[in-house]
């Protein structure tokens, strides 16, 4: 399912992801963009999970909603939640196995707000935090030690970006190592590391 993370502090917010997309069982592409920024709207986000279903690319739909300048921030979040709830529930009911999407959003106001939405089989967990903080999503968070709860304020924006790149790369490497040692493990985290900064 991939790995995404967002870290914010007083200097800004950085989002990072791997670039692997599962197109069929054990068939992958390694050029999927999952981390985005819209500097005009002070938004940054990363998403992973159910990518395409019934001919619809849901990462593109998430991007379209978050870039829509006619919606307020709250309207965007609510619209995302309703849409992904519906599609993960429908997919789960049709396919019969787990269907999930993680969306991490950073919003730069006077304080930086980080939102984590985990939608699994139509059930939503949504949390809002204030930076400095790090949040993560995707299956990669299950194979790595949790991102440390520490004060990230001492890091410059460039240092935050280096930290995020390193974290994503370590997760890609760990998933590959697990798949080498366990033939039943599907290596769904891979490709190049992508980061964006706000």
Question: How would you describe each model-predicted region?
Answer:
Residues 2-92, 125-197:
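Conserved short S/T/G-enriched processing/targeting/catalytic segments and their helical context
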Residues 8, 37, 107-108, 119:
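Generic beta-strand structural signal
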Residues 91-94, 110:
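Divalent-metal-activated hydrolytic enzyme cores
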Residues 104-110, 196-198:
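Short hydrophobic alpha-helical segments used for membrane anchoring or interfacial signaling
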Residues 111-115:
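Structural motif
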Residues 118-124:
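A short, sequence-level motif marking secondary-structure junctions
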């Amino acid at each position: 399912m991939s790995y995404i993370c967002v870290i914010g502090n007083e200097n800004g917010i950085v989002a990072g992801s791997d670039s692997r997309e599962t197109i069929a069982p054990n068939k992958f592409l390694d050029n999927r963009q999952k981390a985005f920024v819209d500097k005009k709207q002070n938004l940054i986000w990363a998403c992973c999970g159910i990518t395409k279903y019934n001919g619809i690319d849901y990462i593109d739909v998430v991007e379209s909603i978050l870039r829509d300048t006619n919606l307020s921030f709250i309207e965007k979040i609510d619209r995302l939640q309703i849409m992904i709830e519906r599609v993960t529930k429908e997919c789960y009911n049709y396919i019969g196995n787990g269907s999930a999407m993680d969306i991490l959003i950073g919003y730069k106001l006077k304080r930086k707000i980080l939102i984590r939405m985990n939608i699994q089989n139509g059930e939503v967990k949504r949390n809002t935090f204030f930076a400095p903080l790090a949040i993560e999503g995707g299956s990669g968070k299950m194979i790595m030690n949790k991102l440390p709860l520490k004060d990230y304020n001492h890091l410059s924006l460039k240092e935050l970006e280096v930290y995020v790149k390193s974290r994503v790369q370590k997760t890609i490497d760990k998933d590959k190592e697990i798949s080498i040692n366990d033939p039943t493990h599907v290596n769904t985290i891979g490709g190049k590391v992508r980061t964006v900064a706000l």
